[in-house]
């Protein structure tokens, strides 16, 4: 693809993103599923494909088919419109949406069976601020290091450690708390199997860490992150189109409280499907849809974790440009209104947008 065409494509994608706005693509609970622009373009259905260096986050076993040294850097610009309809009027959620960065690197020798990868991203985030309920903000970054083993030309395995770095602040009626945690760890393992010509299967399993917070007033509590597993299958159609379907299960029932706030959450399922059209050499167009089940129960809803079931649409594009590979993507999440009873009764509404940009280089 020539430079003029890539410049045109990039400018059109940027214009579309500006027209749509920028926002978050948060998943059930308080997860942030977008790990790269290429992933967002296919609604994060990437575990079976795992065909660029962001596989370090989606499925590190995919690095086994990516020779040499690679690096990627990017950002996900986010915007959110969240509110609750009450008998007395509309209550606005004053919490914002961050712009999480991501950084990935990998090394896989051309004739070797062992490789390594590194992923740094923001997989979880809370930022909700309600006038009557209070405020909660969790900023969490994860550093993952993996060892990759290519069993043969069709099967690869990977395993690694997760290091969580987080800060938490809360202000609720009668309670204020702020702390940070830099000593929490978890682990994960993954597999990619090229089961047949034009077919691939991926599995990614992660054990959630346990974050521990304390402050100078001897207040302390722990926050468990969910265990999760994703199973995926991808199929290439005539070398021109790739179709993928991913199913993710997250164990949000591990989350029981947020400091003094009781939390009642259910395990959730997210279904993701994506299509990639290889319309030119080294260039792609991407489309995706995801159904994301909310984890917050309607009968015991806590707006400090204001997640809702969502339908997500996304599109993206990528191509080589000036010696690097650039990807852009936009996403929109529609959340049907959620009618809540109990202590925080009301009709909760949410809309989310996202614009992601990633740049990768092979050395």
Predicted regions mapped to residue ranges:
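Surface-exposed strand-loop-strand hairpins of Gram-negative outer-membrane beta-barrel proteins
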Residues: 44-49, 79-97
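Transmembrane beta-strand segments of Gram-negative outer membrane beta-barrel proteins
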Residues: 31-46, 64-82
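Beta-barrel outer-membrane channel/assembly domains of diderm bacteria
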Residues: 18, 60-63, 75, 87-90, ...
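Cleavable N-terminal export/targeting peptides
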Residues: 1-32, 363
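Outer-membrane beta-barrel pore proteins
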Residues: 47-51, 56-69, 105-110
């Amino acid at each position: 693809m020539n430079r003029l065409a890539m410049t045109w494509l990039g400018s059109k994608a940027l214009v579309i993103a500006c027209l749509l706005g920028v926002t978050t693509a948060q998943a059930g609970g308080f997860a942030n599923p977008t790990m790269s622009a290429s992933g967002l373009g296919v609604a994060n259905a990437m575990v079976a494909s795992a065909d660029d260096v962001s596989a370090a986050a989606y499925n590190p076993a995919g690095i086994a088919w990516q020779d040499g040294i690679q690096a990627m850097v990017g950002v996900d610009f986010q915007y959110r419109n969240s509110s609750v309809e009450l008998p007395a009027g509309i209550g606005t959620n004053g919490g914002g949406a961050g712009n999480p960065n991501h950084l990935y690197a990998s090394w896989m020798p051309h004739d070797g069976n062992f490789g390594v990868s590194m992923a740094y991203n923001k997989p979880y985030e809370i930022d909700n601020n309600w006038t009557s309920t209070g405020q909660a903000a969790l900023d969490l970054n994860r550093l993952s290091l993996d060892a990759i083993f290519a069993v043969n030309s069709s099967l690869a395995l990977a395993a690694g450690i997760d290091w969580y770095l987080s800060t938490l602040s809360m202000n609720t009626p009668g309670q204020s708390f702020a702390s940070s945690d830099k000593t929490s760890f978890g682990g994960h393992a993954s597999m990619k199997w090229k089961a047949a010509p034009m077919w691939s299967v991926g599995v990614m399993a992660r054990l959630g860490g346990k974050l521990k917070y304390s402050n100078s007033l001897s207040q302390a509590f722990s926050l468990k992150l969910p265990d999760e597993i994703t199973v995926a299958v991808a199929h290439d159609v005539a070398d021109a189109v790739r179709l993928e379907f991913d199913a993710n299960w997250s164990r949000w029932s591990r989350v029981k409280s947020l400091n003094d706030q009781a939390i009642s959450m259910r395990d959730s399922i997210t279904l993701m499907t994506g299509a990639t059209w290889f319309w030119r050499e080294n260039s792609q167009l991407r489309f995706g849809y995801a159904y994301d089940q909310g984890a917050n129960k309607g009968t015991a809803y806590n707006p400090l974790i204001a997640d809702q079931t969502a339908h997500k649409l996304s599109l993206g594009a990528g191509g080589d440009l000036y010696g690097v590979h650039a990807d852009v993507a936009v996403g929109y999440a529609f959340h049907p209104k959620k009618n809540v009873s109990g202590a925080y009764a009301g009709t909760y509404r949410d809309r989310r947008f996202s614009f992601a940009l990633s740049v990768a280089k092979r050395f």
